[in-house]
Regions:
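Arg/Gly-rich low-complexity intrinsically disordered repeat tracts
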Residues: 1-35
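Extended alpha-helical targeting/anchoring segments
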Residues: 37-395
Length: 395
């Protein structure tokens, strides 16, 4: 028979064992949690490998034509028709290793080891938090590591993630393109037209073997394929002419009531085609050279365009916005161009719009900057085909 003393002794042993098991399970759970957090926040380290080669026989377009079939889902970013040597760089990005996209309220991380993470974008976890968290996963050291950033786009509809503005997805917006998409490329080709040099740059993982020679050989290949482009059928638009005119009348009414300062009403056009749309980009850059030319191949879709305008530029601890409002054509006659420029400078409508955009730029920068000022105001900038009225706001 168990005595009271023996019973208490066994009960104490049982309680002690239970306590030890409890604390052991807590320690195990804590260890697993820490391990999971470390895995979730795994950092990817890279070291840059670079090589500079003579570039007087190569252009960004010809080089892109040579490498794009070897390295699919590549990107071309050109700068042309610009006055300053410090900004005259062109880039080709090859071999995506990671990406971050935001669409339908979800941020998706695709990481170098093949893992895919989804993070809901909410009021607490905003789009900028997702982009910052993604960037913090990567640490790149070495010469020219500043070039090894994210390349991609933020679409107009992405305003829903930064402002309290609802965006209704239209039928034509339902495609493969997310609202935000940025890519980290393994290889970069950087063109310096003033020095006639090309910089070949590679992000190399620890223990990896450089394959930069593969890029160099592709660049020096004399044989590459140029494909044709042909439009098929008629150009169509989801909006009829009358529907577009009705939208314009409604926009004018909102302006007259003081609801808004300005409304830009775009109209989508669609054109079926066969062949290579890069030929269309080449035609665009020929008739409209600009400081910002881009062609991105994302696999399921492609985007390209040409723009003279800097949306926002950050250098060090300073941010810059260059409002452009007011445009007139170049004539080829310097005297007539001067007359057109003076007319543009004094035009009341162009001046009203320009003042409004300068004020908007000041307001935008003031939300995140101090010492906001106008660096220059209503400067005439001459491009190959047009003259622009440009100001610069900084903070």
């Amino acid at each position: 028979k168990l005595t009271v003393t023996t019973y208490c002794y066994y009960l104490l042993l049982l309680l002690t064992a239970t306590t030890y098991c409890y604390y052991y399970l807590l320690l195990l759970l804590f260890t697993v949690t820490i391990y999971s957090i470390k895995e979730a926040m795994k950092q990817y380290n890279y070291q840059t490998v670079s090589r500079t080669v003579l570039g007087d026989l190569h252009t960004p377009v010809s080089t892109y034509l040579k490498v794009r079939d070897i390295f699919p889902q590549s990107a071309l970013m050109e700068s042309s028709d610009y006055h300053g040597s410090e900004n005259n760089r062109s880039f080709i990005g090859l071999c995506p290793v990671a990406s971050v996209s935001i669409d339908h309220g979800t941020a998706v991380f695709r990481l170098p080891d093949g893992t895919r993470e989804e993070h809901p974008v909410t009021g607490e976890y905003r789009a900028e938090n997702a982009l910052r968290d993604f960037l913090n996963r990567f640490h790149v050291e070495g010469e020219y590591s500043d070039y090894c950033g994210l390349y991609g786009y933020t679409s107009f509809n992405a305003v829903r993630y930064f402002e309290n503005i609802p965006v209704k997805d239209s039928r034509e917006a339902t495609n493969d393109a997310p609202d935000i998409l940025y890519i980290l490329y393994k290889y970069l080709i950087v063109f310096n037209d003033f020095k006639n040099e090309m910089l070949l740059l590679e992000m190399l993982a620890p223990g990896g073997k450089s394959e930069l020679d593969k890029v160099r050989k592709a660049i020096h290949n004399r044989n590459y394929t140029v494909y044709d482009f042909r439009a098929v059928g008629e150009t169509t638009s989801p909006l009829t002419d009358e529907e577009h005119k009705a939208n314009i009348r409604q926009g004018i009414a909102h302006c007259m009531r003081g609801d808004v300062f300005q409304i830009v009403l775009s109209r989508r056009f669609e054109q079926r085609f066969t062949g290579d749309d890069f030929k269309l980009y080449r035609a665009l850059r020929s008739i409209n050279p600009s400081p910002y030319l881009f062609y991105f191949d994302f696999g399921g879709f492609r985007i390209f365009g040409s723009s003279p305008e800097t949306h926002c530029r950050i250098e060090g601890r300073h941010a810059y916005i260059d409002p452009i409002a007011g445009t007139t054509k170049r004539t080829g006659d310097p005297e007539q161009d001067a007359v057109n420029a003076r007319y543009l400078h004094d035009d009341p409508k162009e001046n009203a719009e320009h003042v409004m955009l300068v004020d908007l730029a000041r307001n935008d920068l003031s939300r995140n900057c101090h010492d906001v000022k106008v660096d220059f105001y209503k400067e005439m900038q001459y491009y190959s085909h047009v003259i622009h009225l440009v100001s610069r706001v900084s903070g």
